[in-house]
From Swiss-Prot:
It is an enzyme of class 2 (transferase). Its EC number is 2.2.1.7. It comes from Bradyrhizobium diazoefficiens (strain JCM 10833 / BCRC 13528 / IAM 13628 / NBRC 14792 / USDA 110). Its cofactor is Mg(2+); thiamine diphosphate. The keyword ATP-binding does not apply. Mg(2+) binds at residues 170, 199. This is 1-deoxy-D-xylulose-5-phosphate synthase. It holds the Pfam family Transket_pyr. It catalyses: D-glyceraldehyde 3-phosphate + pyruvate + H(+) = 1-deoxy-D-xylulose 5-phosphate + CO2. SUPFAM superfamilies: Thiamin diphosphate-binding fold (THDP-binding), TK C-terminal domain-like. Keywords: Isoprene biosynthesis, Magnesium, Metal-binding, Thiamine biosynthesis, Thiamine pyrophosphate, Transferase.
Amino acid sequence: MQTHRAPERPSGADKLEIAVNAYSKTPLLDTIRTPDDLRKLKIEQVRQVADELRQETIDAVSVTGGHFGAGLGVVELTTAIHYVFDTPRDRLIWDVGHQAYPHKILTGRRDRIRTLRTGGGLSGFTKRSESDYDPFGAAHSSTSISAGLGMAVARDLSGGKNNVIAVIGDGAMSAGMAYEAMNNAGAMNSRLIVILNDNDMSIAPPVGAMSAYLSRLYSGKTYRTLREAAKQINKRLPKIIANRANRVEEYSRGFMMDGGTLFEELGFYYVGPIDGHNLDHLLPVLKNVRDMEEGPILVHVVTQKGKGYGPAEASADKYHAVVKFDVATGTQAKAKPNAPAYQNVFGQSLVKEAQKDEKIVAITAAMPSGTGVDIFNKAFPDRTFDVGIAEQHAVTFAAGLASEGYKPFCAIYSTFLQRGYDQIVHDVAIQNLPVRFAIDRAGLVGADGATHAGSFDNAYLGCLPNMVIMAAADEAELVHMVATQVAIDDRPSSLRYPRGEGRGIEMPEVGIPLEIGKGRMIRQGSKIALLSFGTRLAECEKAADELAAHGLSTTIADARFMKPLDTELVLKLARDHEILITIEEGSVGGFGSHVAQFLTDQGALDSGMVKFRTMVLPDVFQDHDTPAAMYARAGLDAKGIVAKVFEALGKDVKTETVKLA
C-alpha cells in the first residue's frame, strides 16, 4: 500500500524565516498555533522549539498541577512527530494521555493550557471532543495499539493513505492488552507505527551514536529494499539453507539491536533503540519510518522522565504527578492535611491486621502508593505483590491465593477494577473464593474526570451472588471494615472508599469486625429518613440540620452494607417515616436500586406507605472539576439533599427558605 507522505520541507534559501518576539521567553513557540506552523520551520529551529516547549510545560504545570514527569520526557518526541508527520490527517494516539501536555500546547490549545484539570478547562488526558488532534481519548493504559490498529484497518478498507502512530510507554507495554494488539497487528500486516517510549530503561541497552546510525540504516529505504530482495531470493533456496540465512539475519540484527527480537517475532519491523531527546537521531528515523510502505513498525525510543527539570530528573516518582509548585525550588504547595487520607488509613489498618494474621497478603496493580499498599509493603515486603498494569491477572492471582487458604486483599481503584470484571465473576464469585477487594477512588475523583471516576462498582458488583459489599462512611468505619473483611472467610467481599482525606474524627485503636448486613442509626427523627451508603453521610448530617430549621424532624442511618442489605432497618425507616431517601456516590443500579427492589417485593410501596426517592450520580459522564463542585452539580451535597426532600413533599425549596428567613 502506498502511504501518505507529508509534503517535503523547503530547503536552503527556500526555508521560511519566522518573525519572532525577541523579548518573549518563548519567541519561537509564540509563532506556532498548530503543527502546520511548526512544519514551516527550519530543522535547526526545531531544537529551539523543543526547549521553549519544555519551559512552557514546566511553567504551566507549576500553576495548575497535574502529571509532570511523563510530559517532560516526551518534549522532543512530541515536537519531532508533529514536525515529520501530517497531523491531524496522520492519526497520533497517546497511550494513557497523561504525557500529552506538550502535544496540547503544539496543537492549538496553548491559550488554555493553564486551565488544565480545572472546571471547564482542558482535560488532563487526550479527549476526542477537545481537538481534532486527539483522534482517540485515553486515561487508562495500554489501549493505543488496539485503537491504532482499528484506525489503520479502517484506512485500508476506505483506501486512505494516512499514517497511524501509537505512542506507548514501557509501563503500559507490560499489560496483556498491548501484546494482544501487537499479535493481531503482526498477523494482519497493516501499516501501523508504534513508538515505544521507554522511560524506565527496562528494555533498552545504552543508546548512542552507533545505535542511532544503525536505526537510520535499518529504517532507510536502501536497507529495506535489499532486505526484501534477499527474502525473495531466500524463497527459492532449499529449506535448510533458507532457514540458516534467516537465522543469520535475525542474529545479526538481534546482536546489534538488542531488545527487538520479541517485537520481530510478533511481526513488527523493529527500529531502535534511539535517544528520544536527540532530534538529530529522532528526525531522520521518523522520516524513514513515515516513508515505509507496508507492515507494522515499532520504533524504540529511550527517554528520561522529568527531562530538563532538575528536581523531576532526581525524583521521578515524586514528580510523576504534582500539585502547584515553585519553579525555582521545586517545592510543592501541599496543604497540611486536616485528616488522614483514606488510602493511608487502609494501609495502616491492614498492617495491624497482618501483624496478627500471617495469611494476609496485599496485591496491587501498579498503584502501591495510590492504594496504600506501599505502607503494607514496608512492613511485609514478602507478603506484598505488585503485578503491574494487569488487573485481570491481579484478580485471578488473588483467587489462586484464596484457594490455598490465604487472605488476599486486592487493592485496586474502582475505575481500574472494571478491567478485571470477568475474572471477578468467573474466577472469584462463581467459586465463592474469599478474595477481599479494597476499592479505592470510589465515587467522583475531581481533576482526573470521567475516566477515573469510581461510579459503577456498586452496580457491577451488586448483581453478583455471594458478594458482600460495604462502603465506609468515614475513616473510623474504614478501620472496622478492614477488620470485617479479614473475618469474612467464606465468600468474596468488597469495601469501597473515596479519594482524599477523612473527616478528622477520633480513630479506633483497633478494628472490630462488624455484624454482616447490619447498618447503624446515626440520628433519630420522625418525618424524613435519609439512608446513606458511603461518605455522603456527612452531607446528610448537614442537610438534617437545615431541615430541622424548617421544622422537619430527620432520621439519619448509615447502611454500611449494600449486600446483604439490612432489610430490618430499611423496613423500619419506610414504616416510621413519611419520606425515605437513599444517598450514594454511585450510578443508577447500585444501593438505591437494591433498596427499591426490596421495598417493591415487600409491597411497601403499594399502599403509599412511604414516599421513596433515590439519589445517585447523574446518568452522564461528568467532566473534571473539584470533587465538591462535581458533587454539587450532581445534587449530592447537603443543598441537593434538602431540595430532594422538598421535592418529595411537593414544596419549593426556594419558597421555604424565604419563609424561614
